[in-house]
From Swiss-Prot:
Entry annotated with the keyword Transferase: no
Residues that make up the propeptide removed upon maturation: 19-128
Residues annotated as site: Cleavage: 57-58
Principal localisation: secreted
GO molecular function, one term: nerve growth factor receptor binding
Gene encoding the protein: BDNF
Pfam families on file: NGF
Record's subunit section: Monomers and homodimers. Binds to NTRK2/TRKB. Can form heterodimers with other neurotrophin family members, such as NTF3 and NTF4 (in vitro), but the physiological relevance of this is not clear. BDNF precursor form: interacts with the heterodimer formed by NGFR and SORCS2.
Compartments where found: Secreted
Designated name of the protein: Neurotrophic factor BDNF precursor form
Coiled coil: none
The keyword Cytoplasm appears for this protein: no
Modifications after synthesis and translation: Mature BDNF is produced by proteolytic removal of the propeptide, catalyzed by a FURIN family member. In addition, the precursor form is proteolytically cleaved within the propeptide, but this is not an obligatory intermediate for the production of mature BDNF. Can be converted into mature BDNF by plasmin (PLG).
GO process annotations (BP): axon guidance; brain-derived neurotrophic factor receptor signaling pathway; cell surface receptor protein tyrosine kinase signaling pathway; collateral sprouting; modulation of chemical synaptic transmission; negative regulation of apoptotic signaling pathway; negative regulation of myotube differentiation; negative regulation of neuron apoptotic process
Length: 247
């Protein structure tokens, strides 16, 4: 009986601890499930004036939980690296919009927020010393990132190695939207166009090289078949090294 009683008590307090999160999810089905959607009313109007601080805590926990789920989901939808050696990374670098996006993709912002949460758990001294700007850190290769349209890309290579035409517009229920791709490549005007930064040129030959990854986009193949396919776009700038012979 004692063990049964203790089990019931633990289960009871476990349910009480989980209740604020569930209530926050129920109240936030119209707005808390995804960032940027506004709900009506205030915490005080729902639970009373004394529940404001407790509600804010549960809201913050819910928001962090949503971010973690989105980041985990991005990991799940990446292609199998064993079957596709060239697909070293899959990210949401494609956006459908009527105009050029003003910010990087959402997952980039979520990863930055996640890094901010990790940094918030550090002490002030650790954060100060971990800041790359304070340590004078520089990238090995200079890169640039920008949104491009299908009009700029024209064609791309799919996962089977075939060349497909990238469609500029995607039909939707209320018209058409343009496909935008967030590409990252080596900066031809940067200081690393002659070689990687910080490499000993006496022993190594270095070169900054743009690498590609797969993203999903609306395309048309050589047989005029339209569909969503994984295509390669520029996603990073890496340093390649070769040892100098005769040394």
């Amino acid at each position: 009986m004692t063990i049964l009683f203790l089990t019931m008590v633990i289960s009871y307090f476990g349910c009480m601890k989980a209740a604020p999160m569930k209530e926050a999810n129920i109240r936030g089905q119209g707005g808390l499930a995804y960032p940027g959607v506004r709900t009506h009313g205030t915490l005080e109007s729902v639970n009373g004036p004394k529940a404001g601080s407790r509600g804010l805590t549960s809201l913050a926990d819910t928001f962090e939980h949503v971010i973690e789920e989105l980041l985990d989901e991005d990991q799940k939808v990446r292609p199998n690296e064993e079957n596709n050696k060239d697909a070293d990374l899959y990210t949401s670098r494609v956006m459908l919009s009527s105009q050029v996006p003003l910010e990087p993709p959402l997952l980039f912002l979520l990863e930055e927020y996640k890094n901010y949460l990790d940094a918030a758990n550090m002490s002030m001294r650790v954060r100060r010393h971990s800041d790359p700007a304070r340590r004078g850190e520089l990238s090995v290769c200079d890169s640039i990132s920008e949104w491009v349209t299908a009009a700029d890309k024209k064609t791309a290579v799919d996962m089977s190695g075939g060349t497909v035409t990238v469609l500029e517009k995607v039909p939707v229920s209320k018209g058409q939207l343009k496909q935008y791709f967030y590409e990252t490549k080596c900066n031809p005007m940067g200081y690393t166009k002659e070689g990687c930064r910080g490499i000993d040129k006496r022993h190594w030959n270095s070169q900054c090289r743009t690498t590609q990854s797969y993203v999903r986009a609306l395309t048309m193949d050589s047989k005029k078949r339209i569909g969503w396919r994984f295509i390669r776009i520029d996603t990073s700038c890496v340093c390649t090294l070769t040892i100098k012979r005769g040394r």
